[in-house]
């Protein structure tokens, strides 16, 4: 079955790549006044085969727009501008080091072409692995091969599909999140401390909302304690789980200190390429290594830049996006938000109704064993609420599609047990929505138009 899921995932990625290629060549790009990775005005540094560089850059140019420009800039230059601090390091740093390794191996491409190629290739590879992890996670949760397959199917053609192939961190985050959830659900004899720690660290350093995934090991740690019999081996496993969480938090704060050092310590000086400095002056960006200029977040009690950067550069905050001019973006995000709000509410309502009368010291163990999906739905409900109230509403679809398996589980419940899908059924409407958003989103995104 894993081979079948991999083929499905790879097929969906090839389809996205082909559609973006055709759309990018057929339609001229929109040119919004947004961040573009600064390029040197000097002679272009081509590889030994300039035509090969041009082929890669032209063929994949539709996958570098919007936030992709930030990720590629970080992969090439690291955190040179303060506004790049909105993007966490896992994806761009991995791309950077893999591209450097490819250069050392003699791959005949320029640095820019190689970084773009690696960024896309890694996402395709990790996407296939993520589809398999989602299948395993669903199977472990429900023990239903049909539902597991349908969840993987919907994931492969999800409504935010383009963002899982473009130079975005969605694929890496989905892989880290689903892997963490799978590790948390393993039995004690199958528990692997390193895997849990690595997955949790991946969540923390991939996206800001990755911090919410700390709730999973905490929940399952508490669950193990409440259900434990007190054996020495079990206590040792719980200790290792706690240690893995502490190590992951330590690595996250190492990144925070690195950023604080770059932007807040006056004795740190950073040499930048001239075109990077010129672009900063043109856009009035605060550049790293200039602590004398200063930034307000450096003086915070907990000097974490993310909230300040999002508020200052993108006007992100409670209900700030509720403006009439943003109505089209609200309409784009509406299907995902309505779907998630309703199903999370319905699940929690039924859970409360079924367990309210059972809440007692003698019954809590049975409740914990029976409702193992509760932390997953609660996590999804919190994310959906955050999307509705705080973030730029158009990112809701891709944020939820990459952060929680619950969307795919709820959607899989509508799918038939056979391949006979009626487009007039709820399953048909759901699949049409996914395919339409996947297709239209790929066409619009690849031509630099806004998309959800």
Curated annotation (Swiss-Prot):
Cytoplasmic side: 1-7, 135-161, 231-238, 306-327, 392-398, 448-452
Swiss-Prot/TrEMBL keywords: Endoplasmic reticulum, Glycosyltransferase, GPI-anchor biosynthesis, Membrane, Transferase, Transmembrane, Transmembrane helix
EC number annotated for this UniProt entry: 2.4.1.-
Gene source species: Drosophila pseudoobscura pseudoobscura (Fruit fly)
Topology of this chain in the membrane: Multi-pass membrane protein
Residues in compartment: Lumenal: 29-113, 183-209, 260-284, 349-370, 420-426
PANTHER family (UniProt xref): GPI MANNOSYLTRANSFERASE 2 (PTHR12468:SF2)
Source taxon at top rank: Eukaryota
GO BP annotations listed: GPI anchor biosynthetic process
Localisation: Endoplasmic reticulum membrane
Pfam family, one: Mannosyl_trans2
GO annotation, cellular component aspect: endoplasmic reticulum membrane; mannosyltransferase complex
Protein name: GPI mannosyltransferase 2
GO MF entries: alpha-1,6-mannosyltransferase activity; glycolipid mannosyltransferase activity
Transmembrane segments: 8-28, 114-134, 162-182, 210-230, 239-259, 285-305, 328-348, 371-391, 399-419, 427-447
Pathway field: Glycolipid biosynthesis; glycosylphosphatidylinositol-anchor biosynthesis
Task of the protein: Mannosyltransferase involved in glycosylphosphatidylinositol-anchor biosynthesis. Transfers the second mannose to the glycosylphosphatidylinositol during GPI precursor assembly. Required for the GPI-mediated endoplasmic reticulum exit and proper targeting to the cell surface of chp. Required for GPI-mediated membrane attachment of chp, qsm and Cont. Essential for microvillar stability in the rhabdomere.
Keyword S-adenosyl-L-methionine belongs to the record: no
Family: Belongs to the PIGV family.
């Amino acid at each position: 079955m894993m081979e079948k899921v991999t083929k499905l995932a790879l097929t969906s990625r090839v389809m996205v790549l082909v559609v973006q290629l055709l759309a990018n060549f057929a339609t001229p790009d929109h040119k919004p006044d947004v961040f573009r990775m600064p390029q040197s005005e000097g002679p272009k540094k081509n590889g030994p085969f300039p035509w090969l560089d041009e082929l890669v850059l032209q063929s994949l140019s539709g996958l570098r727009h919007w936030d992709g420009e930030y990720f590629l800039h970080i992969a090439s230059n690291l955190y040179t501008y303060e506004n790049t601090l909105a993007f966490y390091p896992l994806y761009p740093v991995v791309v950077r080091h893999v591209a450097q390794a490819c250069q050392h191996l003699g791959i005949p491409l320029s640095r820019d072409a190689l970084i773009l190629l690696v960024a896309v290739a890694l996402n395709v590879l990790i996407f296939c692995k993520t589809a398999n992890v989602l299948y395993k996670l669903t199977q472990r949760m429900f023990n239903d091969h049909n539902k597991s397959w349908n969840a993987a199917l919907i994931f492969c053609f999800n409504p935010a599909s383009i963002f899982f192939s473009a130079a975005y961190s969605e694929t890496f985050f989905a892989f880290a999140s689903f892997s963490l959830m799978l590790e948390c659900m393993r039995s004690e004899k199958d528990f692997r401390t390193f895997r849990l720690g690595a997955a949790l660290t991946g969540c923390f350093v991939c996206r800001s909302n990755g911090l919410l995934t700390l709730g999973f090991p905490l929940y399952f740690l508490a669950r193990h304690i409440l259900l434990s019999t007190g054996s020495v081996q079990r206590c040792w496993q719980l200790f290792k789980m706690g240690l893995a969480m502490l190590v992951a938090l330590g690595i996250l704060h190492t990144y925070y200190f690195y950023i604080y050092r770059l932007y807040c310590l006056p004795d740190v000086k950073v040499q930048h390429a001239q075109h990077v400095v010129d672009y900063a002056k043109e856009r009035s960006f605060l550049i790293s290594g200039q602590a004398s200029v200063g930034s307000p977040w450096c003086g915070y009690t907990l000097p974490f830049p993310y909230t300040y950067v999002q508020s200052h550069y993108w006007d992100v905050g409670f209900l700030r996006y509720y403006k009439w001019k943003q109505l089209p973006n609200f309409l784009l995000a509406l299907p995902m938000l309505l779907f998630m709000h309703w199903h999370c509410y319905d699940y929690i309502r039924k859970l409360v109704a079924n367990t309210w009368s059972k809440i007692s010291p003698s019954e809590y163990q049975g409740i914990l064993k029976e409702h193992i999906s509760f932390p997953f739905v609660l996590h999804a409900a919190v994310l959906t609420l955050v999307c509705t109230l705080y973030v730029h509403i158009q990112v809701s679809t891709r944020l939820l599609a990459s952060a929680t398996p619950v969307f795919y589980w709820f959607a899989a419940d509508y799918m038939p047990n056979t391949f006979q899908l009626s487009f007039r059924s709820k399953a048909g409407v759901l699949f049409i929505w996914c395919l339409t958003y996947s297709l239209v989103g790929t066409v619009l995104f690849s031509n630099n138009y806004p998309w959800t």
